[in-house]
Amino acid sequence: MELRDLIGALEAPMLMGADNVDITNIQSDSRRVTKGSLFVAVRGTAVDGHAYMDSAIEKGAVAIVCEETPSYLEGRCSFIVVKDSAEALGLLVSRWYGDPSRKLMLVGVTGTNGKTTIATLLYEMFRKMGHKVGLLSTVCNYIDGEAVPTDHTTPDPLTLHSLMARMVEAGCEYAFMEVSSHSIDQRRISGLSFDGGIFTNLTRDHLDYHKTVENYLKAKKKFFDDLPAGTFALTNADDKSGLVMLQNTKAKKLTYSLRTLADFKGKILESHFEGTDLIINGREVMVHFVGRFNAYNLLAVYGAAVSLGKDPEEVLIVLSTLRSVSGRFETIQSPLGYTAIVDYAHTPDALTNVLNGIHEVLDGKGRIITVVGAGGNRDKGKRPLMAKEAVKLSDQVILTSDNPRFEEPDDIINDMVAGLTKMDMERTLCITDRTQAIKTATMLAKKGDVILVAGKGHEDYQEIKGVKQHFDDREKLREIFSTQQS
């Protein structure tokens, strides 16, 4: 593709040099540049691509997109100067792949909790309705039925548009994706054409990156601000930030709620470990999900499907057949008559939601034993809050290690303990080894009790000193249960 055809996707680019050069590929990592590359110099959180423009030229880049050009490089290749090279990258890659997101009905899901569940259930629902569908999520990306492993909630623009192009090639009509606050702030979703957006909730998370809750909220809100007319913006009316998301959007404004009047109104009739009886917009449905937080997720799924033109009755029928997402309130039964639940809850609010969901079902008839940790090199402020919520809503808590990364696990546990009183500590054990922590919980549990193993969910690794070592909470529990005699 010629450079002039590519830069037509950009707003007011300043070209220095020839525009008729042939581009063989687009790169934002100078190490991947080859002969004929267009190199986009992006200012990242840790690395500034502008420092590698010289290296990119030496490796064969014939054009560079940047925010400023050093005079000593002028004349060595074509330069395109833009206001925001991160924004430009997405637009260029989209053009390179033929703007694939415009050929799909693309819906983004953002918020602190619930993104994976909502995006995955929409993917499964639309497949059950006979459509070819794509999914971009924390757990895995899917092109119709083909799994494509993932490392981030939202991939980089090169991967993202490449996946979208593969979805179009595979005949997909719809795509559902998680949209993280990082990806919005870093313009990783630049160049994508969304047909709708869903907001779940907003609680403390990622403050190691955003610094304040206000910045975190602004990042989420920008996604809705950028939705054009003719799309839909569906928000949780019961979350204090829900209506804020709709303030400046041009999209059709829609709400879902369990507490107030809304376009999609739900009510919980009864909860049990097999599922929940719900009323949605006056129609009763039995679903295979537990807890109030999941009722919100299902309302969002219902609302999005109806907003995409699906028949409400058909949506309810399919909703009743859907099952829980991997590592989200995933139940494993012990032969000794107690239940283990593995959940990804890794924020204070998510932990509260899951524990409240367990209480709704137990109704005071069994004890709750919670195994929980906090990730290393992430928001330290949430550590004492996690411990506090766990103790408040559990009968016994075991604090343990959870992806310590480059921190010492005991230091993280000490940060968690800082949120507890002497009385709280009477119901709290600190066991650094996660395997031992899970084993201890199973030794303490009796018939009718529930063990919650929180924080990792679908993850099958522990990240220690930069190395991901295999570790799966579900595997550990099944190994223990396989040795138990009823």
From Swiss-Prot:
The keyword Membrane does not apply. The modification N6-carboxylysine is found at K220. Its main location: cytoplasm. It comes from the Bacteria. Meso-2,6-diaminopimelate binds at R378, D402, N403, P404, R405, G455, E459. Pfam families: Mur_ligase (PF01225), Mur_ligase_C (PF02875), Mur_ligase_M (PF08245). Pathway: Cell wall biogenesis; peptidoglycan biosynthesis. Its EC number is 6.3.2.13. A motif (Meso-diaminopimelate recognition motif) lies at residues 402-405. GO terms for molecular function: ATP binding; magnesium ion binding; UDP-N-acetylmuramoylalanyl-D-glutamate-2,6-diaminopimelate ligase activity. ATP binds at G111, T112, N113, G114, K115, T116, T117. InterPro entries: Mur-like_cat_sf, Mur_ligase_C, Mur_ligase_C_dom_sf, Mur_ligase_cen, Mur_ligase_N, MurE/MurF_N, UDP-N-AcMur-Glu-dNH2Pim_ligase. It is found in: Cytoplasm. One of its GO terms (biological process) is peptidoglycan biosynthetic process. One of its GO terms (cellular component) is cytoplasm. Carboxylation is probably crucial for Mg(2+) binding and, consequently, for the gamma-phosphate positioning of ATP. Catalyzes the addition of meso-diaminopimelic acid to the nucleotide precursor UDP-N-acetylmuramoyl-L-alanyl-D-glutamate (UMAG) in the biosynthesis of bacterial cell-wall peptidoglycan. Belongs to the MurCDEF family. MurE subfamily. PANTHER family: MUR LIGASE FAMILY MEMBER, UDP-N-ACETYLMURAMOYL-L-ALANYL-D-GLUTAMATE--2,6-DIAMINOPIMELATE LIGASE MURE HOMOLOG, CHLOROPLASTIC. This is UDP-N-acetylmuramoyl-L-alanyl-D-glutamate--2,6-diaminopimelate ligase. It comes from Parabacteroides distasonis (strain ATCC 8503 / DSM 20701 / CIP 104284 / JCM 5825 / NCTC 11152). The gene is murE.
